[in-house]
């Protein structure tokens, strides 16, 4: 199972949000590149980067920082936030991002999604962010009327191979992920599922591994040191 440390970018800094609320941010590192290098040194194989400003604006807003991270580390990087066009996808790939995460565009622009899947296949990951079972978009500011299960089924039909599922109410809370929703998702689709939001302990990670999750994204727990990245990597590797 892949372990992905999270770096959320806002105004060029590394921050954490609470339940997706932009007015509840905590700056965890003024220097995202340095943070990326710390995660690499601790043994991470892949980084998960979200351009929070971009998610709201609908276009990349921290591109230079993402490029600097890609240049500074040798491990792979997946990134998203505000990716709504083919040129935006190609820009991220050109600066060294290995996998591009789509969110809002996957729900609202199906022809675009189909085109990028045709062109880039498994390099495209779709992030499904849900609140009370329904999908949220535009940096979690807008709620839709489609359930996370229905969107996952649609993504599978289009040819998406990997999704990131986040229960927004759990994000940044250290209360554990939504195991029930993740289990239901796994029963309904054959996609590779990366779990995100609320992961707080080694026990959470072990339970996700027992559920055969493809990966897990860890953010706040690493910054607040309630989890040790090296220990998590060691335990998941030995299982």
Curated annotation (Swiss-Prot):
Its EC number is 5.3.1.16. It catalyses: 1-(5-phospho-beta-D-ribosyl)-5-[(5-phospho-beta-D-ribosylamino)methylideneamino]imidazole-4-carboxamide = 5-[(5-phospho-1-deoxy-D-ribulos-1-ylimino)methylamino]-1-(5-phospho-beta-D-ribosyl)imidazole-4-carboxamide. One of its GO terms (molecular function) is 1-(5-phosphoribosyl)-5-[(5-phosphoribosylamino)methylideneamino]imidazole-4-carboxamide isomerase activity. Keywords: Amino-acid biosynthesis, Cytoplasm, Histidine biosynthesis, Isomerase. GO terms for cellular component: cytoplasm. Belongs to the HisA/HisF family. This is 1-(5-phosphoribosyl)-5-[(5-phosphoribosylamino)methylideneamino] imidazole-4-carboxamide isomerase. It comes from Bacillus cytotoxicus (strain DSM 22905 / CIP 110041 / 391-98 / NVH 391-98). The gene is hisA.
